[in-house]
UniProtKB/Swiss-Prot annotation:
Protein name: Tyrosine--tRNA ligase
Family matches, as NCBIfam families: tyrS
Any one of the GO CC terms: cytosol
Keywords: Aminoacyl-tRNA synthetase, ATP-binding, Cytoplasm, Ligase, Nucleotide-binding, Protein biosynthesis, RNA-binding
Amino acid sequence: MNIIDELEWRGAIYQQTDEEGLRKWVEEKQISLYCGIDPSGDSMHIGHLIPFMILRRFQNAGHRPIILVGGATGTIGDPSGKKEERKLQSMEQISKNVESLRVQLGKIFDFEGNSAASMVNNYDWTKDVSILDFLRDYGKEFNVNTMLSKDIVASRLEVGISFTEFAYQILQAMDFNHLYEFNDCRLQIGGSDQWGNITAGLDLIRKKQGENAKAFGLTIPLLTKADGTKFGKSEGGAIWLNPEKTTPYEFYQFWINTDDRDVVKYLKYFTFLTEAEIDELAKQVETEPHLRAAQKTLAAEMTKFVHSEEALEQALKISKALFSGDVKALTADEIEQGFKDVPTFVAEDSEANLVDWLVTLGIEPSKRQAREDVGNGAIYINGERQQDLEKIMDASDRIENKFTIVRRGKKKYFLVSYK
């Protein structure tokens, strides 16, 4: 299957320039193509992952991906999709973010073989461009009326936009032109909000490299959820690729909780499963939704891809323990990962009455509420229901003498460590 046909089947194309030309080009040649990300933070979230999944599909089809980390453009900030001016970050912070993103992106692509990926930083070719060179060599090629008509800029005209952000599309166009000239890069991929920036790059390439220069642009649809909420967010915030921000267990749980109405779409977008495999899972969503086979497959595939097989196994073990309530089977290390973001308390290394202990730690707001919850069977210690108001908490209630896991009700967990 032609890579363009595959992307269309997966619902991953929103707009493209010269569709037939691109289709023919990728059939006849191995091409280089790129996608960029600005280091506005020290970690990607799963929303950032979407265009890079497309880039990886091109690599699987035998093409050469170029991953651009925007050390230069990141100093300015892309106005796309922003209602107000971005706050500028220090160069030191941007440099740290660049390195963090390089590590994350390095896990997603293959950097060896005939279709080896490469990683570049646009700061390398932008840092020595003087303001006069910028205005003469590049600014001269851009018509202000055309720039104002771009959706990126037009949406900001009422509230105002600085020249810094207004000029962002010129810098991104410079990137595409540079990669075309020095890396034979023929295609830029981006989100649907990047169309204006991508077409600006194509215009610059034609002006700098000649009218016959062959270059293409492709954008990806905005991924939406069936319930109308923003993709990539959970109740706790963004789902990060950095395991210190979102543990592999939390990452796995995000995917396994996917709505039946969204799961087939996500399987197409995010996994490398074949059409036949996804069709089979789609049937199971219709006939046996309670088994959640599609969600389990999606969660497993994504956790392996972003983290590792070992991380998946650990996430499965934690999930099983929490589902069964047998949290005693978890090691202290697994508890630290699985309960990383639950409310955590530090208790004295001494015995105490359960009711007093819950109130002293702050798990319960009052003795009255604590007695009510214990008496009603709403309190679980290490997975075991405790209804004895006279129970004494001691060393036997600790896992590996480090942690006690408290559950209130069905889902509210607390982690207690000891001084």
